[in-house]
Amino acid sequence: MHLKYYLHNLPESLIPWILILIFNDNDNTPLLFIFISSIHVLLYPYSKLTISRYIKENTKLKKEPWYLCKLSALFYLLMAIPVGLPSFIYYTLKRN
């Protein structure tokens, strides 16, 4: 996957975290929702399109293969690890 996409959408996925830090929100903000939405904004629109295009280019298939959904879910999780790890660490530290 391309680094340019990550760098373009990284500030967009960090906006909820920046707002919490700016306004010093001490009440029970749904941090898990913010954590999931920041990962979803950054990764989901790109993951399935890129994987399907890569498979079609390399295998010369005309239609989507049966394993595309499982493969895109696996790559979605693998891409979410480096993006969501800082948010997850912040979420667990704030919870304790």
From Swiss-Prot:
A Pfam family: CKI
Source lineage: Bacteria, Pseudomonadati, Pseudomonadota, Gammaproteobacteria, Enterobacterales
Subcellular location field: Cell membrane
Disulfide bridge partners, by residue number: none
Domain of life: Bacteria
InterPro entries, alphabetized: Colicin-K_immunity (IPR035265)
Protein name: Colicin-K immunity protein
UniProt organism field: Escherichia coli
Keyword Cell membrane: yes
Transmembrane segments: 73-93
BP GO annotations: bacteriocin immunity
A GO-annotated cellular component: plasma membrane
Predominant localisation class: membrane
Purpose of the protein: This protein is able to protect a cell, which harbors the plasmid ColK encoding colicin K, against colicin K.
Keywords associated with the record: Bacteriocin immunity, Cell membrane, Membrane, Plasmid, Transmembrane, Transmembrane helix
Membrane topology, from the record: Single-pass membrane protein
